[in-house]
């Protein structure tokens, strides 16, 4: 079917309209369409994609450019220069029976009906038409395929083999997709070079039983994998995570997303709406977003940066998933863990800023602004006590109120991990060993200083009290924070400031982390990236924001990340492959 669509698109795009018409085409499509695809224009997408790849890597652009231009050249030679310039939209229904191809139609904003028919037929003269009712006509192209076409007002719709969607469009539906879509869904569909709309509720209604059967099979496979690897705790966490995704699909109404190719970055933006009677939608009535500008004060040099603005229920859900991977049987298998989870509902809303890195151990610097400071500080103490009971912890000590610095009353928690128990049945897996060793360090230990000043809670891993002081000082030195870095500014300028969760990944630190893991897997020292890897910090990341009708998701990959991957990660991977092949 996709090959048919491609052929039709190539043959039918024979004129250009003076303005962006994709929004107008939405007014021609039935509101209950299952899937809609919207393309800005083949020539524009080709130019944007080639420009983005070249900005990320002249090598990548040089490899992709000729192939893209060749395709455009072939289309131009066969169908004319206008063939590549017009935007188009594809509307699709769900199949009516198993094995039946879905009915769909291509819509293009062109008024020269006869020229389009000649291109579709592959003939010099317009094909002989036969009326099939409702203003729809059919003809046979030179390869013997039946084509159905409709000459609309300022647009043309056509399809192959099935006239169902073309007839629905020709009937001028009273309820159209254009009138159905909210502003957020419309922007998500049309905001980039390539957009998709999916009627999730219709798909769930049609295939709900099959989806539920897939869920049961998938969960059973996770249980089996957990038993075989003796990692049931991690599998329980995975089951909760994927189970939540299956549940979300049941409550979802519509999804729209777009991909945008720009010289400055690759952008993905999506919006998911929920059913009006769904519990998830009811929970969003009191949802609040927060401003992520505080991330700018965090110091550079970390692998991961994160902002979160969460209500107690959401925080409890996150901690419950963490407990599933930390304790056998999850929180229910640890009274202390369950007690801590129960206390989460009393803490109120929390905003947190976190910087974290791996490699030689976990290094964390976090600042939390809680609604209830005293309860949150007490909960942090209880969390450290609870973690000490995890089978993965060999030794643990907690010293309360060991120091006061800049108003923060600091506690000290020290833990030594049981490397073998963390690996479980994966003790003989070099990749697993490399991952764990990178996280816990050579001495398998970590020390965290944490406490509040009555307004906010700070947490910092450090080998000494003096180092903890230095990290706390970094939080107040905004002139030295990542906010001054071009890589941070490039990322944040393309993400919404008001959000519930935002993450940013340091590309250089990611390359070094991967090099450390692969070096361990190969039985040697960490593999350092080549000296010519760019040193200017490049960040990529994304965000998730609640909305009264659903959720907005954004992801940004700035072009500056490309040279880091090309000159840093690619040589490391190639070096490992060379060792394996020797």
Give the ranges of each region predicted by the language model.
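Bacterial N-terminal signal peptides
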Residues: 1-12
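Structural boundary/hinge residues at secondary-structure and domain interfaces
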Residues: 16-143, 182-362, 368, 374-412, ...
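Short, solvent-exposed coil/turn segments at beta-strand boundaries
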Residues: 30-31, 101, 150-156, 265, ...
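Long compositionally biased, domain-poor regions of proteins
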Residues: 81-93, 339-363, 373-374, 386, ...
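A conserved glycine-rich beta-strand in the N-terminal activation segment of trypsin-fold
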Residues: 140-219, 440-530, 534
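Composition- and surface-driven signal marking solvent-exposed, interaction-prone regions
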Residues: 170-172, 271-273, 282-287, 320-321, ...
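A cross-kingdom marker for long, charged
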Residues: 288-292, 451-453, 539-582
């Amino acid at each position: 079917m996709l090959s048919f669509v491609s052929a039709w698109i190539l043959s039918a795009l024979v004129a250009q309209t003076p303005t962006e018409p994709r929004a107008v085409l939405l007014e021609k499509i039935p509101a209950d369409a299952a899937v809609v695809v919207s393309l800005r224009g083949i020539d524009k997408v080709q130019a944007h994609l080639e420009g983005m790849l070249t900005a990320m890597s002249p090598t990548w652009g040089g490899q992709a450019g000729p192939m893209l231009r060749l395709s455009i050249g072939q289309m131009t030679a066969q169908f004319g220069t206008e063939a590549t310039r017009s935007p188009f939209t594809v509307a699709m229904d769900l199949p009516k029976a198993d094995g039946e191809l879905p009915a769909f139609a291509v819509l293009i904003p062109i008024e020269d009906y006869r020229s389009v028919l000649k291109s579709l037929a592959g003939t010099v003269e317009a094909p002989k038409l036969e009326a099939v009712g409702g203003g729809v006509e059919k003809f046979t192209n030179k390869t013997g395929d039946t084509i159905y076409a409709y000459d609309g007002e300022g647009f043309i719709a056509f399809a192959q083999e099935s006239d169902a969607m073309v007839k629905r469009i020709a009937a001028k539906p009273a309820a159209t997709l254009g009138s159905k879509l909210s502003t957020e869904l419309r922007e998500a569909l049309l905001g980039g070079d390539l957009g998709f709309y999916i009627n999730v509720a219709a798909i769930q209604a049609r295939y709900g039983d099959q989806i539920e059967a897939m869920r049961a099979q998938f969960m059973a496979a996770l249980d089996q994998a957990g038993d075989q690897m003796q990692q049931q705790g991690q599998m329980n966490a995975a089951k909760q995570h994927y189970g939540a995704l299956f549940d979300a699909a049941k409550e979802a109404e519509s999804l729209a997303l777009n991909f945008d190719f720009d010289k400055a970055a690759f952008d993905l933006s999506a919006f998911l709406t929920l059913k009006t009677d769904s519990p998830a939608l009811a929970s969003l009535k009191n949802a609040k977003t927060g401003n992520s500008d505080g991330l700018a004060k965090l110091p550079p040099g970390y692998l991961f940066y994160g902002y979160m603005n969460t209500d107690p229920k959401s925080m409890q859900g996150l901690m419950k998933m963490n407990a599933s991977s930390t304790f056998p049987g999850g929180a229910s298998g640890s009274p202390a863990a369950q007690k801590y989870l129960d206390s989460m509902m009393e803490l109120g809303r929390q905003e947190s800023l976190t910087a974290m890195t791996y490699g030689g151990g976990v290094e964390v610097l976090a600042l939390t602004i809680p609604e209830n400071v005293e309860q949150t500080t007490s909960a942090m103490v209880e969390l450290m006590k609870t973690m000490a009971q995890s089978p993965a912890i060999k030794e643990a000590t907690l010293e309360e109120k060991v120091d006061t610095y800049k108003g923060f009353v600091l506690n000290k928690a020290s833990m030594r991990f049981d490397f073998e128990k963390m690996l479980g049945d994966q003790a003989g897996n070099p990749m697993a060993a490399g991952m764990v060793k990178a996280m816990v360090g050579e001495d398998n230990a970590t020390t965290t200083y944490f406490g509040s000043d009555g307004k906010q809670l700070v947490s910092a891993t450090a080998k000494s009290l003096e180092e903890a002081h230095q990290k706390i000082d970094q939080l107040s030195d905004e002139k030295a924070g990542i906010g001054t870095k071009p890589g941070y500014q490039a990322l944040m300028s393309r993400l919404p400031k008001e959000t519930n969760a935002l993450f940013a990944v340091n590309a250089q630190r990611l390359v070094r982390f991967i090099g450390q893991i692969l070096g361990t897997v190969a039985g040697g020292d960490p593999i350092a990236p080549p000296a010519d890897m760019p040193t200017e910090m490049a960040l990529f990341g994304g965000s998730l924001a609640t909305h009264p009708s659903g959720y907005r998701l954004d992801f940004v990959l700035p072009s500056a990340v490309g040279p880091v991957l090309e000159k840093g990660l690619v040589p490391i991977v190639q070096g490992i492959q060379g060792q394996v092949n020797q």
